[in-house]
């Protein structure tokens, strides 16, 4: 099998951690490295969390590189209220002692693009590292095969303001630079589709019943997330945004959308808003495939069966039994 080569650029983060799990459990993908950006938590904490997840999966062979830690212009705002003080739902998993992250996320991205053909980036945090790569070496950054990003909103309302999704809101200038300068079609896996990906109480109860170490870890790190979603949105369960970007990259039939020109608001009350030019007001060539529809059941089947293949039969039974109301 010819594996798809990727770098995961992320800010772990509960759902980032679930996305890393899915990527590493998918034989179609070859994860060349994980680069860390500040977002859900500061980059240093995010790097420590990435190592914790890699250790749990027995994949400390994958290098972790940390970015500069600050957005291009705006002061950093993190989301410990959503992800817990440690970024992993206040589980306080033990620090990894036998491995460490390295500095130089931007250089790692650029060197990897110079050395590897057909390398894609899946960016599930703020776009600071990608923007700084463009600042440093635009020609090399444009060599990436695809940029799949979790961020933005089109028809959906925002999750940190009425109109802005968190990743673009944290570093709107970085997002603006990427959309305007990358010169590659971007795929925007935004809130229009990710809001439909909910780890429901039924799924969580199923995971508990498996008595499986990885299932137990998922339950453990999402408990805080579940409480947050109930308190803030009256959602039962938790929305897991980031794994959908991985799933779509593996199987694009899971989502559908349309190409548009997209720009990002960098100031004012709408800061971080993704402006999707549905009416062709700007008369510019599309720079982004904006996903608007998702087969949530197909996603959940992929996500759960890949992470827990030994429980595939039970997972299929739950997914296909309407009485569970998933």
Which positions does each model-derived feature cover?
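Conformational coupling and interaction surfaces
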Residues: 2-3, 22-23, 30-31, 169-173, ...
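Short, mixed-charge, low-aromatic patches
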Residues: 3-10, 63-69, 88-89, 129-135, ...
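Generic secondary-structure signature for well-ordered alpha-helical cores
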Residues: 55-60, 69, 93, 114, ...
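A residue-level signal for conserved active-site and pocket-lining positions in enzyme catalytic cores
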Residues: 64, 178, 246
């Amino acid at each position: 099998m010819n594996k798809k080569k990727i770098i995961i650029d992320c800010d772990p983060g509960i759902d980032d951690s679930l996305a890393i799990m899915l990527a590493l459990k998918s034989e179609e993908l070859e994860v060349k490295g994980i680069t860390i950006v500040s977002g859900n938590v500061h980059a240093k904490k995010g790097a420590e969390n990435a190592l914790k997840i890699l250790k749990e999966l027995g994949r400390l062979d994958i290098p972790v590189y940390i970015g500069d830690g600050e957005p291009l212009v705006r002061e950093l705002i993190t989301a410990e209220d959503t992800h817990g003080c440690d970024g992993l739902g206040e589980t306080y998993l033990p620090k990894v002692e036998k491995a460490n992250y390295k500095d130089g996320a931007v250089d790692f991205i650029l060197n990897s693009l110079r050395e590897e053909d057909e390398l894609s980036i899946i960016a599930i945090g703020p776009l600071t590292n990608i923007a700084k790569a463009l600042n440093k070496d635009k020609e090399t950054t444009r060599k990436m095969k695809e940029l799949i990003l979790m961020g933005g909103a089109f028809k959906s309302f925002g999750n940190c303001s009425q109109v802005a999704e968190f990743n673009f809101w944290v570093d709107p200038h970085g997002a603006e630079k990427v959309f305007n300068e990358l010169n590659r079609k971007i795929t925007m896996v935004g809130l229009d589709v990710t809001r439909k990906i909910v780890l429901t109480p039924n799924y969580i109860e199923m995971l508990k019943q498996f008595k499986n170490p990885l299932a137990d870890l998922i339950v453990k790190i999402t408990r805080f997330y579940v409480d947050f979603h109930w308190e803030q949105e009256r959602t039962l369960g938790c929305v897991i945004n980031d794994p959908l970007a991985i799933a779509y990259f593996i199987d694009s039939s899971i989502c559908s959308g349309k190409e548009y020109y997209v720009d990002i608001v960098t100031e004012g009350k709408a800061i971080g808003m993704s402006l999707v030019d549905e009416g062709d007001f700007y008369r510019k060539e599309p720079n982004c495939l904006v996903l608007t529809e998702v087969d949530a059941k197909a996603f959940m089947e992929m996500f759960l069966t890949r992470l827990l293949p030994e429980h595939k039969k039970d997972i299929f039974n739950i997914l296909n039994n309407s009485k569970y109301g998933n």
